[in-house]
A protein has these predicted regions:
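Structural motif
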Residues: 67-68, 81
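Short, positionally conserved secondary-structure boundary motifs
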Residues: 1-62, 76-79, 91-92, 98-102, ...
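Hydrophobic beta-strand signal
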Residues: 70-71, 84
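Well-ordered beta-strand positions enriched in small/hydrophobic/aromatic, beta-favoring residues
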Residues: 52, 83-85, 105
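Compact nucleic-acid interaction/catalytic patches
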Residues: 86, 93
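Residue-level recognition of conserved beta-strand positions in structured domain cores
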Residues: 95-96, 107
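Catalytic Cys-His active-site segments of thiol-dependent hydrolases/isopeptidases
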Residues: 104-110
Length: 136
């Protein structure tokens, strides 16, 4: 019987929940730490990452569901990236899209509208991985 290689884990801060639906508030301080293997997730060890728990169903088309944990990295987004963003002061998890030089946020569920910032769009992190409990 072969044993699988052991991967070291590192604790990442769980900063609260993020709405995958209509934008809402997000916590700013760590509630706990989540052990994550940078090797398994293919994330560089020096990456500045954090974890949020998903609440809502606006990203089901991207296979991100209510209760999932998302690992996000602090870095600039590229067109098409899934991001945690503050749009006009409220946090949400959406796809970052640039059209005609203007960024907006797009849900991966047709029940939700595109979000065009009236004033401000601040990217808080770019999705690196989704973690789901088995059987969820």
């Amino acid at each position: 019987m072969r044993s699988e290689p052991a991967y070291a884990t590192e604790p990442l801060p769980l900063l609260g929940e993020i709405v995958a639906g209509r934008p809402g508030a997000v916590e700013g301080r760590a509630e706990a730490c989540v052990p994550v293997s940078f090797d398994v997730l293919e994330i560089q060890r020096n990456a500045r990452c954090f974890v949020l728990k998903v609440k809502g169903d606006s990203m089901i088309g991207a296979h991100i569901v209510d209760g999932d944990l998302v690992v996000l990295e602090l870095r600039p987004p590229h067109d098409g990236a899934i991001v945690a963003a503050l749009i006009d002061g409220e946090a949400t998890l959406k796809r970052y899209v640039v059209r005609n030089g203007r960024p907006f946020l797009k849900a991966e569920n047709p029940r939700y509208p595109e979000l065009v910032p009236a004033q401000e769009l601040v990217i808080q992190g770019v999705l690196r991985a989704v973690v789901r409990k088995a059987g969820a």
